[in-house]
């Protein structure tokens, strides 16, 4: 649930070459993000507290499509489903038989999932961006320019031009690490993947 809400609200062994935040870093990150109009992958997510103690570990699958469409399904036993049709987000909790529906916040600092599925053409207006590169791996660190966010730092890592993992760090040092596997880019995804059908008998909360 924590990962879902952060997405909503939102050490390499090689010697890395640091790159100062400049227009080249911004342009490179924007290009890498925008070249994938669709993405599908499995993910594994690990949450650690500020001292490094494991708090939660989950797995699941995701599908993304620009602009602003995503389907993020966490496996049982902590099953959750988050679906965006580009205008609203539906969060389904099968254990509670409850769906929460809210308007999609288009701000990248409030909805990190949009970094992979939304409009990132003005990403530098929301974040200070720095990059480090080693071989075929590029790490981008994004720090929000405003304090009204659910995370203090976000790292996106690309391997051979494809998203490999991401990490979010909140104000108390809690880390959420997400590793993507079996990533497929720019393949057709059924439109129904981004339409949530409310189950019969479910409690519905509109926010």
UniProtKB/Swiss-Prot annotation:
<comment type="subunit">
    <text>Monomer.</text>
</comment>
<dbReference type="InterPro" id="IPR004564">
    <property type="entry name" value="OM_lipoprot_carrier_LolA-like"/>
</dbReference>
<dbReference type="GO" id="GO:0042953">
    <property type="term" value="P:lipoprotein transport"/>
</dbReference>
<keyword id="KW-0813">Transport</keyword>
<comment type="similarity">
    <text>Belongs to the LolA family.</text>
</comment>
<dbReference type="InterPro" id="IPR029046">
    <property type="entry name" value="LolA/LolB/LppX"/>
</dbReference>
<keyword id="KW-0574">Periplasm</keyword>
<keyword id="KW-0732">Signal</keyword>
<keyword id="KW-0653">Protein transport</keyword>
<feature type="signal peptide">
    <location>
        <begin position="1"/>
        <end position="23"/>
    </location>
</feature>
<dbReference type="GO" id="GO:0030288">
    <property type="term" value="C:outer membrane-bounded periplasmic space"/>
</dbReference>
<dbReference type="Pfam" id="PF03548">
    <property type="entry name" value="LolA"/>
</dbReference>
<protein>
    <recommendedName>
        <fullName>Outer-membrane lipoprotein carrier protein</fullName>
    </recommendedName>
</protein>
<dbReference type="GO" id="GO:0044874">
    <property type="term" value="P:lipoprotein localization to outer membrane"/>
</dbReference>
<dbReference type="InterPro" id="IPR018323">
    <property type="entry name" value="OM_lipoprot_carrier_LolA_Pbac"/>
</dbReference>
<comment type="function">
    <text>Participates in the translocation of lipoproteins from the inner membrane to the outer membrane. Only forms a complex with a lipoprotein if the residue after the N-terminal Cys is not an aspartate (The Asp acts as a targeting signal to indicate that the lipoprotein should stay in the inner membrane).</text>
</comment>
<keyword id="KW-0143">Chaperone</keyword>
């Amino acid at each position: 649930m924590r990962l879902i809400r952060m997405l909503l609200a939102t050490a390499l062994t090689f010697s890395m070459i640091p790159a100062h935040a400049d227009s080249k870093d911004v342009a490179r990150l924007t290009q890498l993000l925008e070249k994938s109009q669709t993405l599908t992958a499995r993910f594994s997510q690990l949450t650690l507290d500020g001292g490094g103690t494991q708090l939660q570990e989950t797995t699941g699958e995701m599908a993304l499509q620009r602009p602003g469409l995503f389907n993020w399904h966490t496996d049982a036993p902590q099953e959750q489903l988050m679906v965006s049709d580009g205008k609203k987000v539906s969060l389904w909790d099968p254990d509670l038989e409850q769906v929460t529906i809210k308007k999609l916040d288009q701000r990248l600092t409030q909805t990190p999932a949009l970094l992979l599925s939304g409009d990132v053409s003005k990403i530098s207006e929301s974040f200070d961006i720095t990059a480090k590169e080693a071989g075929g791996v590029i790490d981008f660190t994004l720090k929000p320019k405003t304090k009204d966010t659910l995370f203090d730092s976000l790292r996106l890592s690309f391997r051979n031009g494809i998203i490999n993992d991401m990490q979010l760090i909140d104000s108390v040092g809690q880390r959420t690490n997400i590793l993507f596997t079996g990533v497929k880019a720019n393949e057709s995804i059924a439109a129904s993947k981004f339409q949530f059908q409310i189950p019969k008998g479910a409690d519905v909360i509109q926010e």
